[in-house]
Each structure stands twice: as C-alpha cells, then as structure tokens.
C-alpha cells in the first residue's frame, strides 16, 4: 500500500488535508477534509507541477500526460488530473472520497510531487461552452493548493 498526503494552504483562510492511498495496481483513493470555503461546488484537480513559489499560480496546468481535452472524471476524454467538483456545505467544510484510476502513486505517471488545487468556482466538466471549458473547466481562480508527498 502506497500512501501520500497534501496539506492545503491558502492566503484566503482555506485549509485542509488530502490523503491518497493506492494498493498495487488498484485505483487511487482520495480522502479529503477542507474548511474555509464558500458553500457550493468547487473544481478539484491535480496540477502538473509541485511548485508553490508563486502560491497556487505556479502549479502549472492540470496534470495531462495523455494530451487530452478537459472533461469529467467519468469521461474517457479528460486530463488525468480532472477530479471534478467537491461539494462544500453551509458550514464551509467539505469531506469527500474520490476513487480514480488515472492518478497513480507509483510508476512513470505518478502524481507524487505534483500539486492538488481547489478552485473558486464549479468545474463545468468541459461541457459549459465557455472558451475555458475544454482546458480548465472554467473553474475560476486557484484558492488553495498543496504538494502531494509520499507518506510513511
């Protein structure tokens, strides 16, 4: 069993912990607890770079090793890092579990060392018709992020 963690920080008062686990070649399970967000849907993605020197802006684009267009987690055509939306309750917190086969913790396409990002707005899953739908899901600004690191 491989385990990883990302601790989310932001200048906007958002904080949280995202745990990743993968058993062999099985899909990766993502368990998250985040607080300080506005209620509603927020885009949630793995971004290509584990660089936070300029805050969440330096994490690069969505992780996309296959060079595909943006989509929903269940779509065949999607970025590997497209994990859809998280739902934030009226109290500003989100607790969620995602299982995904395109974000391995080992091998050449591992997400270790990359970043996880929470966006300000809902991800339209590539179906919104906006000019940014097919690249970012038109999910708005990056309000919290953390680097995915191996856990002992």
From Swiss-Prot:
Top-level taxon of the source organism:
Eukaryota
Q: Name one GO molecular function term.
A: copper ion binding
Residues annotated as signal peptide: none
> Which residues are connected by disulfide bridges in this protein?
56-145
How does the cofactor attach, per the note? Binds 1 copper ion per subunit.
Q: Which residues bind Zn(2+)?
A: 62, 70, 79, 82
Localization per record:
Cytoplasm
Reactions the enzyme catalyzes: 2 superoxide + 2 H(+) = H2O2 + O2
Kindly state the subunit structure of this protein: Homodimer.
Protein's name according to its UniProt entry: Superoxide dismutase [Cu-Zn] 2
